[in-house]
Amino acid sequence: MKTIGIIGGMGPMATVDLMQKIILATDACEDQDHIPILVDNNTNIPDRTAAILGQGTSPVPELLKSAERLTAQGADFLIMGCNTAHFFLPLLMPYLKIPFISMIETTAEFCKQQGLQKVGLLASAGTCHSGIYQRALQHVGIEILLPTKAGETAIHNMIYAGVKAGKQHYDTTDVQKTLQDMCRAGAEAFILGCTEIPLAVSLYALEGNFLDATQILAEKAVTAAGAKVIRKLPISKTVLSTEISTY
């Protein structure tokens, strides 16, 4: 069985969430059936959104340090749970010595398998402005809907003032309005395109048809490591948050 290397710390809770989803997605009867996982919880990685918006330091040097440490420790391939960090992947790839599985491409391919034609993106401002999901979905022939500026701000605040701040309760009225507006615009499902958003779905009981990019990546990683997935994500028009985010 291959060893998974997780470039983590973006943020720490999201890193734990990805690792937990890998463990829960693995068909295992005993400890020895589980996949070896190495995690570099590098909290020195600068904020990715700030870097994309030209307001902060590039995360590339620290991302590369994490990749090198994981490679040296024996990882067979790399993943990272931070959607926004994938914007910098082209700058990392020339220096990586082992394969990297992209959360963005994996999620886009999953949307295609479901037969979706139009999806909404719930993500940080950095991810929305980076164009990473727009390019990946366009490549597989799927239209993407982005939140309005007000919706983007509401989602950003929920991520930073809610989940990252460790708040167990948070007023999501503006976020729920954003979901309703995007549904009216034709969104068949929503990609949870920031690693904190699946946590927000669970913590703050958001309602909608959600595609958890973290869960999709976790199941892809399980397969790539040579283990069996205990339960495949459903291939249907919509995937409810309870089906993806809570098992």
Please name every model-derived segment.
Residues 1-247:
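Non-catalytic structural scaffold of enzyme domains
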